[in-house]
Amino acid sequence: MLVPCRECGFYLVSFISANRGGTANLIIRPRQKVIFVIFCRGLFYFPLCKRSANAETEEFMNITPNIEKVKSLAAEYKTVPLSAKIKCAASPLEVLQKLKAISSHCYMLESCEDREKWGRFTFLGFDPKAEITCKNGCVQITDEFGVRRFNSNPRKYVLQMLAEHKSPRLDDLPAFTGGLVGYFGYDYAKYAEPKLKLDAADDAHFKDMDLMLFDKVIAFDNLNDCVFLICNMQTADVENNYAAAVSEIEIMAEVIESGKAAKVEKPRLKSDFKPLFSPEQYCEMVEKTKHYIKEGDIFQAVISNRLEAKMSGSLFETYKVLRRLNPSPYMFYFSSNDIEIAGASPETLVKLENGTLYTYPLAGTRPRGKTAEEDTRLEAELLADEKELAEHNMLVDLGRNDLGKISRFGSVEVEKYHSILKFSHVMHIGSTVRGKIRHDKTALDAIDAVLPAGTLSGAPKIRAMEIINELENNRRGIYGGAIGYIDFTGNADTCIAIRIAYKKGGRVYVRSGAGIVADSVGEKENRECINKAGAVVSALKISGGG
């Protein structure tokens, strides 16, 4: 794609370089030979002429806040989000496909509040400023300075990144204006609980954590039919950084308007799905779990099974099908060099919004009815099931305890107790737990306190995780962890990593589990696992033409 400078007529041409997979930008005159080469982390370098990149943009884009407002914020904040609102004929999915042509690192976050009503904002990002990953205590940071590795708890470096980009909450902007986006795996819990030993077999080699720092955000406002283009500028050098951020916003608009879509290979399943455990093996794990319950070790544990198949192509088409088949409160697509994730999760892990914490335990499951009458019957049956109610109550108590670790004394409350939440393939019993976060705690503390959710581990949580580690003897990876964001303002919104397909190294995985209590029946719990995996497996088969 060519981006001409309106003032001097230079063009900027971008192509993938051999230098660590980066991008080479060639600045050329029209119909002239290449005269300069620059390597940078992103697709575009700032236009050569500030006049065309800044003044003309502000003239027809209305960039906010203005430079004087930014100067007033610079004393308190290291980062300020600049934004512009534009109209856009393309859909979020069409824009995402254009972003995939620019960067292998991209994401899309959206929400469906019920089966037909989509959430107000859809967030997209590309070309991260940095990436931080961790595996078995080895932290890796990749940014403009190269690759650095440390043997450490990743918490220190995550907090440092967020502190370096502390940003104000500005009126009239979407909830997310920039921050860390990605996943915390199930095994990330060992960094919050050092005494927890998770040493199960690791055949798929997923990272414990993969977060990318996005300082540019494209936010579709589905209510007002417009798009926010957001670029976070550093306040250390306001004059130059303001001009640079304005230039980035102009480039984002150009990409959305006239960028070319990536050619995305459809997924192709090259083998049948193979379960990690046969029905007989799963039932045996259920019986062993019940033995631990009878011995008084635990009240409940969530035992999972994993489906695995060989696959070529991308999960992008799978995501498009999944959002149609299984619209959910958390819909997400995430891509990096290491992994690709498509998911539709019904359940929040933890949300922090302006000082208030939320978690929403879901437990108790029935399939959706084929008719309205059958649906109503199954709903009544679920609410009358003492085993399901006991499981749910246990997890509500666990949610209260988790939030209590980081909430102000007396602020934790339970709302909407025993509500029925319906999704495309299943229904659940749900409740809301909320609290006010302590002044000395952060969004990362909230994730540390709650992950993994009781609905994916059990109660008491630590002992249940030890038993899961023993019985499954297979690292869960992303499944049961968290997917979402921590933003530069200190807020966070994360969902439980369930109802997901994740692809790595030519293989795709789908994992699901069931809560085991004293009177669980193995065959029934195995069927529950199959039901929970149904929407994702269907999306994979349909998107590949199967």
What are these regions (language model features)?
Residues 14-17, 52:
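Serine residues within intrinsically disordered or low-complexity segments
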Residues 61-546:
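Extended alpha-helical targeting/anchoring segments
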Residues 22, 32-33, 56:
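Charged/polar low-complexity intrinsically disordered segments
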